Amino acid sequence: MRPFWREVRAWLQASTGWPVQCPGTAHPLHAFRWMVSKPVYNNNRGGTSAGWTIKLGDSPVIGTAIHSGSDVGRACQSLMCIPDPDRQREEDPFTEHFIADFPTQIIVHRSRFQVDLNRAREAAVYRSPDQSWGLNVWREPPAEEFVNESLAFHDAFYGELKRVLADVEKRYGRFVLVDVHSYNHRREGPKAVPASQDGAPDINIGTSSMDRARWAPVVDAFMEALRGRRFNGEPIDVRENVLFQGKGEQTRFVHANFPETGCAIAVEFKKIFMDEWSGKPDWGAIERLRAMLASTVPVLEAAVRGMT
């Protein structure tokens, strides 16, 4: 085994408690997929792909895309009655591309329809249509064994997130987590008039779960950097707490566990980068939004360093 991977394996095993093998060895990671300078792949039991990918970088700025995944696995798929197009329309496809230039990235591959990591544990498995945009998800109520397995995934993710953030905190003192999502604005149908711009900004910044005054230098600098950019020839519309207020579980978790040192900013991109009904992406738009978000990384790093 090369010395580099020996060090990586030792660090992963110490931080997670999981047995780990390195690329080129006989067995893959036993638990989840990681990227640490190089990707390490895994297939979990039941045919599901790896739960998430983490790429660790040298920066106090972290980008996450926890709703980008669409994997439900064969076992879960057999329990579902929701058509794939309906399910995928409520996921956040392509958001992993928006954080591709972030030093540290956390990307979840599991669909929110199996377990929603941005909801509190007790609401993380959708049990009724009122939890899932009026959509019927299951052929019949999921068995408690299945629910418990899904909640174990929720627990494992937040346990790992806490370890990663604690390490970043130890190294830099403070950190910023940019929690990237997307939202639909043509809910009445593919040919319907889109939602009014007044209530549907291109980028909605959610800050309600943070100490807004404390983190004003960071959030204000972030929003100013975004507002200085143009999209399709027009200034990008960036507003705070309009359609979403940043009340998801991930931002709450960060501020509850790192109240003095962690700033989690919820960022909702309107799906102006794709056809939300067909699922077809506009790769040019995705690349422009990716570059826009990438431009905020040095701004956030400077803002964090400047806090006293």
Tell where the protein language model's regions lie, with residue ranges.
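N-terminal catalytic or cofactor-binding beta/alpha core of small enzyme domains
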Residues: 32-308
